């Protein structure tokens, strides 16, 4: 440490002896110094020697146990003036110089500003690209889950698994928006601005209404008298239903629902789809499309819905990559939080896309290829996000991603989570089981993002 700094520390210590503060912030700063270096609010010669070691006037030995301090944050000159009741235009003279000496001495000894700079240090460019590329690669592997999990779709327990992951996606997306992205867009710091409690209240308001609404529906609903039709394997054997064929709904994604007419039923109850009707929820129009799912048709024979889904999904993944890239430039932990939210959302999203592409006329290989190609646009978004985050203020990207996460979680996935139960709930016990699974998924996602936000300063990715 420079000798000039040691001399400054000694001068400050001498200056404090000129005044005898009995109250106010100067007493708190003095107690911080005396509690660490002295005993019983006094300083012996040996203890003064340790203080001199800390200031660099003597060789330093051992580490300090700071304990509980009154002020353990970085204070600017304006902050020190304000704490002592001085305005920014006040001129410090010998009569009031001793009042601010303990504050300056405390800042010199404990270096809170250096800790703040270390905490706010941005990751290196290689770390940003490395962790960003790894995160996007893991997320893109979710596009392959459609092929792996297709055999499980017909299992009785699969709706419960999918319900949990949809709830998990809602919890992580919503929490990431209110805890990370939107506050970052406004320039808030969770350690300084103390917005976390208010963000928890926002989630609490949403969850409370969800819990009350679902509970009332379970208590007041009369099961077995639904206004929609359940399809069983024996339904397709009656003549009446042969003349009036029903339609079987497929998963709804991006505002589009596919309905397949059951033409041939195998003895085990599995249905071959010879035609698919694509119904857009926006205009209500229906387009027939030939479907031969297990062969490789020409691209011109594939339904328009497949290309619309592929393009929309590519744009969606581009924005996801943009958010990950901008988050990684800010901090690796912020990038991890955003990546977790996107990963949880991609699992049910990509699975639904895969099923729709199959029923639009693509073969399994074609659906897998185009689903993966649309997922690769996330790399392009990652590159743009890193470039913007390193050269410009990324706040606008965080605001855009925060709004997108809120829309996907509340306007897209939340209704889907409720609609997917219509054909599965047969009684109050089943309804309660799915309700608990929904709660488990949402609360798991909420807790994960909350813990990352609260302990962001204590977690280091190296």
From Swiss-Prot:
Question: Pfam family example for this protein?
Answer: Zip
Q: Which UniProt keywords apply?
A: Cell membrane, Glycoprotein, Ion transport, Lysosome, Membrane, Signal, Symport, Transmembrane, Transmembrane helix, Transport, Zinc, Zinc transport
Membrane side Cytoplasmic: which residues?
154-160, 213-367, 412-431
Which residues, if any, are the signal sequence?
A: 1-19
An annotated GO cellular component of this protein is: apical plasma membrane
Give TM regions.
133-153, 161-181, 192-212, 368-388, 391-411, 432-452
Give residue spans on the Extracellular membrane side.
20-132, 182-191, 389-390, 453-462
Q: Which GO terms describe its biological process?
A: arginine metabolic process; bicarbonate transport; cadmium ion transmembrane transport; cartilage homeostasis; cellular detoxification of cadmium ion; cobalt ion transport; DNA-templated transcription; extracellular matrix organization
Q: Write down the glycosylated positions.
A: 40, 88, 96
State the compartments where it is located: Cell membrane; Apical cell membrane; Basolateral cell membrane; Lysosome membrane
Q: Does the keyword Membrane apply?
A: yes
- Induction annotation: Up-regulated in monocytes upon adhesion and recruitment to arteries. Up-regulated by the pro-inflammatory cytokine interleukin-1 beta/IL1B.
How this chain sits in the membrane, per its record, is:
Multi-pass membrane protein
Q: Give an example GO molecular function.
A: monoatomic cation:bicarbonate symporter activity
The source's domain of life comes to Eukaryota
Q: Subunit structure, per the record?
A: Homodimer.
Query: Family assignment?
Result: Belongs to the ZIP transporter (TC 2.A.5) family.
Protein name per UniProt: Metal cation symporter ZIP8
Organism (species): Mus musculus
Q: What are the top taxonomic ranks of the organism?
A: Eukaryota, Metazoa, Chordata, Craniata, Vertebrata
Q: Which gene encodes it?
A: Slc39a8
